[in-house]
UniProtKB/Swiss-Prot annotation:
Organism classification: Eukaryota, Metazoa, Chordata, Craniata, Vertebrata
Covalent S-S links between cysteines: 97-189
Role played: Odorant receptor.
Record-given protein name: Olfactory receptor 4M2
PROSITE patterns assigned: G_PROTEIN_RECEP_F1_2
Amino acid sequence: METANYTKVTEFVLTGLSQTPEVQLVLFVIFLSFYLFILPGNILIICTISLDPHLTSPMYFLLANLAFLDIWYSSITAPEMLIDFFVERKIISFDGCIAQLFFLHFAGASEMFLLTVMAFDLYTAICRPLHYATIMNQRLCCILVALSWRGGFIHSIIQVALIVRLPFCGPNELDSYFCDITQVVRIACANTFPEELVMICSSGLISVVCLIALLMSYAFLLALFKKLSGSGENTNRAMSTCYSHITIVVLMFGPSIYIYARPFDSFSLDKVVSVFNTLIFPLRNPIIYTLRNKEVKAAMRKLVTKYILCKEK
């Protein structure tokens, strides 16, 4: 990369999702509804698992961590996007952009690693039921969660370190509603091929390796379920849980691979996929995981009755 004298860009201008006021109002209502479902839904999951003495297995501990990451991940972009619907000139400072990039990749990569840990937990519970409590003990569970967070942190540091060394001299317009790394790299005043290659390898490696590990574990489990088909309610319940996990994996990794594991060229679907990845995807935790789990639903009803309805009386 050449080291020349450039006029340093101090802010970026975001184009947003639409410039039409009527469309912006409709989008605001839709995305506000999504965010107001994500926030209390995942907070309720965390509170339920934390306060209910029966939800102490590793699966629920991992689910609470996933709920926290969903709140964090969606809150990195959603509040600013909602405000920008009513702002004519959508601006984010250079430092704010770097911070947004860091936390977005930190939370996103941590969630990918955590989903892999959850697949390991499901595999152990089904294939090694007699040794499950010994294998997935509290210590190992905490270590795996900590490693997921550390992996996300390292990945995010790599992405940000590559961005801050690039020169930005204008233009400073990002064709997005948030500080997307693919857009930022595209407007740098230098040959960004080496940085882009490392970013793609980092994101692609995490996405592809985690996806392969997840699909292999689920393929093994589905093959096992096929042999045990008709063996009872527990098998059907485990199979239903497995399909829920597979749905999550497809919704998480599909958009991420599309956006970050390819050359950073602009395509017409980029904004749609980004919205799905940053705002719609976090909806799936309360919907797919929680509403399909009888124990969590029962604990939620008990929590609402005890702490909310009783206070109103």
